[in-house]
């Protein structure tokens, strides 16, 4: 008995453009017995069916690729959260410390 049976194809819409004519999708499927991860733009054809475009990437799902992708996503999320925390709690100090003296240009202030 299998405790978990993976679907034959995984698909998730990651983003949609403003006029709903393009999507970015994360898709995992098998091709010739090997699993692949795709991050690809999709468009609607004349019959309003979503079709994959040539814009995107596909990579084999193996331990090294999956680990590298996971590490990259964790780093991106960590950096975004760190920046948000710094801006929220220290924007006044940052803005004060980086104001130029005796110059005509100004460093943009961080808004919270």
Residue ranges of each PLM-predicted region?
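General helical secondary-structure elements
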Residues: 21, 36-37, 79, 105
């Amino acid at each position: 008995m299998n405790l978990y049976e993976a679907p034959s194809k995984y698909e998730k819409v990651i983003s949609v453009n403003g006029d709903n004519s393009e999507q970015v999708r994360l898709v995992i499927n098998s091709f010739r017995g090997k699993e692949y991860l795709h991050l690809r733009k999709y468009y609607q054809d004349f019959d309003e069916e979503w079709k994959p475009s040539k814009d995107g990437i596909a990579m084999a799902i193996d331990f090294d690729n999956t680990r590298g992708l996971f590490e990259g996503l964790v780093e991106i999320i960590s950096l975004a959260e760190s920046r948000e925390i710094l801006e929220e709690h220290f924007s006044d100090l940052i803005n004060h410390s980086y104001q130029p003296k005796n110059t005509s240009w100004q460093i943009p202030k961080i808004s919270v």
